[in-house]
Curated annotation (Swiss-Prot):
This is Biotin sulfoxide reductase. It comes from Cereibacter sphaeroides. It is an enzyme of class 1 (oxidoreductase). Mo-bis(molybdopterin guanine dinucleotide) binds at residue 121. SUPFAM superfamilies: ADC-like, Formate dehydrogenase/DMSO reductase, domains 1-3. Keywords: Metal-binding, Molybdenum, Oxidoreductase. GO terms for cellular component: outer membrane-bounded periplasmic space. Belongs to the prokaryotic molybdopterin-containing oxidoreductase family.
Amino acid sequence: MGVEPFAHDPAPSELIHSVPACGSPERRVMRPMVREGWLADRQHSDRRGRGRERFLPVSWDAALDLVAGEIRRVSADHGNAAIFAGSYGWTSCGRFHHASTLLKRMLNLVGGFTGHVDTYSIAAGPVILRHTLGDDRACGGQANTLDSIAEHSQTLVVFGAMSPRTAQSEAGGIGAHHLETYLRRIVERGVRVILVSPLKDDLPDWVAAEWWPIRPNTDTALMLGLAGEIVRSGRQDSDFLARCTSGSELYLAYLRGEGDGRPKDAEWASTITGLPAEAIRALAGDLPRTRSMLTVSWSLQRAHHGEQPFWAALGLAAVIGQIGRPGGGVGYGYGSLGGVGAPFTIGKSPAMSQLSKPINSFIPVARISDMLLNPGGPYSYEGEDRRYPDIRLVYWSGGNPFHHHQDLNRLSEAWTRPETIIVQDPMFTATAKRADIVLPASTSIERNDLAGNKRSDFILAMGQAIAPLGEARSDFDIFNALSGKLGVAAAFNEGRDEMGWIRHLYEESRNHAQRHHHFEMPDFETFWAQGHAPCPVQRDHTYLAAFREDPGAHPLDTESGLIVLGSATLARLGYADCGPHPAWIEPAEWLGKAQAGELHLISHQPKGRLHSQLETAEASLAGKREGRDEVMLHPDDASVRGIADGQTVRLWNARGACLATAQVTDSVAAGVAILPTGAWFTPAEAEGPELSGNPNVLTLDIGSSAFGQGCSAHTCLVRIEAHAGDAGDAVRIYDAHLAAILPT
């Protein structure tokens, strides 16, 4: 089996060369299995045996009977809200064999489930933008397109990142990677680019950006300081503020320091961010004079008070007054996924329906440990007072919370609370190891599917390349068989098999393009034979252009119909951690109140794998030493700790500890450590550190605020020291532990 790039992709990802590794038996779930203790005692088993007890093989029919029996038992005894349908995962970009969607489709047919809202990638940001911009399209790829920015912007301020590293992938797949093309056009035009980030590599070096190595979690203060300087010098666009915003008087009063006596100026911002006041003041003078675009990566809102940088960026853009003009304004998430900012589909993307929901039970996605540890406990979300459901059954398909959740030691404790945990996955992830029932799903190269989404200009055929390994079945086949056990197969499959559904989903997109956009896509046979079909797309898009021209005729879906800079809704709610205007609120952990020796840990996306996927492929292994991921340290921070490049180090705080390999580089700001996510959770057998370099044993598991409840992974202080002794190879240790609990 070989791999070659898509012919229409100008900058294909190197990750495609890791795809054949999916066909390897290494760490694959090869047959249905049940934890020994659970098989003996079912819901009364010792739940601390998860991850420790041996698995026993069972037939597919027996496994499906057990799963169907648990769904029926929990539904009858505790109600369907006691079933948690996992969150989501990147197990496949296929839109038909989309494991999470198919699980929820099946469960909706038998009474429903508790689900989730928002994502680990982005939660606080969309919540605040829904109330201040009326929707979250600006962070989902429908702000100014990159082609418009490349042709019209004169000053580009990148808060966080705009990196091809994080733009390699896209939910639903991506046909063409456009980011590098537009970045090179930006360079060609001589656009001034400023990168505000603790990591210099968050833009390619050939962009030659000015690097502003900001303290993590302080971007809000910089945005407020820039806006305050513009207002202080009288260069704000008063006409735009009057016509297109509401509550601006509250926001402007805060910038002037009328409430707290401290104007938000360059000196104030400098003391918080660590950036020179002179540079802040100079940039504040330049932004209104040039066509200026602000971009904010999703990473900024994965922090305590993560709503604030998204709202503060909107406030700064409103003060500058270029929202709705080509190459001006603000946008979110460029580079966070491959399709954000690219020409976006205006047609219908292929997608399976979850069907209607019999119950509306959900949690904010990153509050899973809170839910499991505090059944019935109160919490707030988006202005509503809610209570956590009492979860008895967890069914997780195609996801790995022991990768993407925070404070994994706390999650490990929470994981002992449900009566039964079912995991359906191709791989024996750390989550699958901690299941009661494990069902082997096929990978995307072992079945037919199609890919496509709102941020891609193609629908792609995904033809089966190899036979499924072992006894693996496709997600559709698993849920179809399970639906039969539950008596809802006809409603689940609607009389279609795999290829019948793929044809149906494609034809829906094709007919929509023809009917609504007079765009001709090839018939299904041609599409399947050539492997792709173009979609109708919007190019050279300027976000909010019509609104700027006539706000009355094109109102936003906000409390005022305008951009909200002072919110009556948030004023009424009275949250201390998310007030009525953009504001600097100290995070729970940051360098401004660090103890001696503490560093700020950032856990960003890895280069050599997709989150925790493709962990065993060569590209991922090449970024490890002794099976451990590398943590980036500034030379000064390494020197004072006696740490050499390539040395094993221990990172720790009150929440946990892990080992990693030191990578000493001046590309990271002093006081900051950067350890990528996705290493497979490998706790030591005895009390000791996690061995693979998984940063989520260290990260903070609190909501961004009572309003947004997003994850706060980037609010994290740690200590680092050289590790003495031989810790062994983490990859081999994981494999040895897995072998010990699998059937012989």
